[in-house]
Amino acid sequence: TVAYAYEDYFNGTIAANHGYDMYGALVKHSCVCQGYAETMFYLLREAGLSCAIASSENINHAWNIVKIRGNWYHIDATWDDPVWDMPGRSYHDYFLVSFDTMNKNTLINHTKDRTDMVVSAQWGDTYTTAVDTTYESGKFWNGIEKAIFYKDGYWYSISEGSSKTSFNINKYQYSTNINKVLYSGTAKWTTPSGGYYPGVYSSIYLRGDNLYFTTPDSLNKIDITSTNVTPTELINIRTQYNSSTGNNLYAFGEQYGKLVYFITDSPNIKKTKDSSNSSKYNKEYAEYTFEMCISHKWDAGVVTKEPTYTSTGTKKYTCTNCGETKIETIAK
């Protein structure tokens, strides 16, 4: 995942830390809009899609344009990634939208718009105009404010349920347009004063067949292959950290190559400048690491069953980082 290089932006160290390029995004996991746009441009191009980078001096910003099934759309990966960085949280308001929709959303928080847009670095077809709104409603990512994960033909997400204090964990198949709710729950994100924040602030993370998700109190996992989905609680912040009501688990996800979760009293996670060091920013939340290997490194493997000319064999591999094992079949 990538975090917006907010501290570098404030400290004037963007260029020194590769915040303007793909190295910052893919290696350092931190960049500004130009780094997001160049990385997205590369990925779209690798997928064989006509695309370009767009920029606006009005709002000092860069984003992308892509052509799908004969129509052009805008993608702004930067503005769909909240700052300060909140692991697990990812918006989809600027994903495959028309220019008018993007510009309207821009004016919600800015006094200037993107009508001075300049298109550069075009690859494939030449950009004309982006007016189609096909992907702005009725799609599985519309309204989702958390990361979405893909595995074996299915997309996994978490969304608001039937009320402001309920949530659904979804398993969606794009080819059939069928969504299955794997698990439903309730969660109330309380405030220190006794109220609560309406909405879903849970996050999910998919690793193998295990889908991890958070509630205000706990980190849990479910087996996505199970016919009877029952959550297993892994961490309870009330007992493990003695966290009081009003302090909740608001963020969970991958950040800088590790899995982290934040405990704080507000969903609006932030940092403030250190009073004694102007280049340092202090976290207004407690950060913890969830010990799970997110990048397996398999050893050479050990044959556990020799193959014959009539039957297959098996070979066992062990991750040198975490000790997890896997079994692969050896052809007969």
Set out the residue ranges of the language-model regions:
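Hydrophobic/aromatic-rich core segments of domains that either
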Residues: 34-100
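Secondary-structure boundary elements
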Residues: 1-25
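Repeated scaffold domains used in trafficking and secretory/extracellular systems
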Residues: 136-151, 189-207, 240-257
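Surface-exposed loop/turn elements that mediate protein-protein interactions on large endomembrane-trafficking
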Residues: 124-139, 162-194, 218-243, 266-294
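Short, solvent-exposed coil/turn segments at beta-strand boundaries
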Residues: 69, 149-154, 175-176, 203-210, ...
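Residue position within the beta-strands of beta-propeller blades
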Residues: 155-159, 212-213, 261-264
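His-Asp-centered catalytic microenvironments across diverse enzyme cores
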Residues: 71-183
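Extracellular modular ligand-binding repeats in secreted and cell-surface proteins
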Residues: 293-332
